[in-house]
């Protein structure tokens, strides 16, 4: 009864490889002066040879002011007062598995005509690709302060940061439709994010032994497009250089 059902089977397989090396150097002088250097060397098969490997360094330093000798008389009131600063790079392989290679898609039961009562298998000609795609790079700069007062009952931290995302994957400038295919994506977009975060907490114990804690978190951030060449006419329906994400 009812309409017959034609069973179909579909499948997909892809393969890609990553490899990375990581190193870290720490220095701590009497808990007052802190220094750290990191290095990453990452590779991905999603890019062509020559663009597969990239080095991503980072560095951070801290000064625990509360451990200085001139702070000893008020250590009961100020248990921690640490200033932090850091700068670093990370990579993002934000591309498809075979996006730098021309591939032919094959689809079963996909034709608009029938052969022996069944839709035939179809294949699509490959489009244009960019052979120069490479890693997106996220550059982060952060300044922070950790504090704890009143025998660590009042504690918190404040961070101010700037994060720049370089060489994001974006659409290339449009070409005439007579080309007959879509324009490939390229590393042509940059984004800058500015923000801050504040965390304040209070932990204490009542006279009956009951412990309690409360915390408050505040944050704000905005992102600005600093490079986007695919909208030279500044069309409102597309991203614009200098525009803040989310602006109306």
PLM regions with names:
Residues 1-248:
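Extracellular/periplasmic, surface-exposed regions of secreted and cell-surface proteins
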């Amino acid at each position: 009864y009812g309409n017959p059902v034609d069973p179909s089977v579909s499948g997909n397989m892809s393969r890609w490889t990553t490899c990375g090396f990581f190193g870290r150097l720490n220095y701590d002088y009497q808990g007052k002066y802190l220094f750290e250097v990191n290095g990453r060397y990452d590779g991905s098969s999603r890019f062509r040879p020559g663009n597969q490997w990239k080095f991503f360094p980072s560095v951070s330093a801290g000064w625990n002011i509360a451990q200085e000798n001139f702070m000893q008389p008020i250590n009961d009131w100020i248990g921690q007062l640490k200033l932090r600063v850091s700068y670093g790079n990370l990579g993002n392989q934000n591309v498809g598995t075979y996006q730098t290679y021309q591939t032919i898609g094959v689809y079963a039961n996909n034709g608009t005509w029938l052969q022996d009562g069944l839709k035939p298998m179809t294949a699509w000609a490959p489009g244009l690709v960019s052979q120069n795609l490479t890693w997106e790079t996220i550059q982060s700069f952060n300044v922070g302060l950790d504090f704890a007062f009143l025998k660590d009952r009042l504690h918190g931290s404040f961070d101010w940061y700037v994060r720049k995302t370089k060489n994001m994957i974006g659409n290339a400038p449009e070409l005439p439709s007579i080309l007959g295919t879509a324009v490939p994506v390229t590393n042509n977009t940059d984004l800058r994010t500015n923000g801050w975060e504040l965390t304040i907490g209070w932990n204490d114990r009542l006279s009956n032994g009951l412990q309690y804690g409360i915390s408050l978190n505040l944050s704000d951030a905005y992102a600005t497009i600093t490079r986007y060449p695919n909208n030279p006419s500044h069309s409102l329906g597309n991203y614009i250089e200098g525009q803040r994400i989310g602006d109306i």
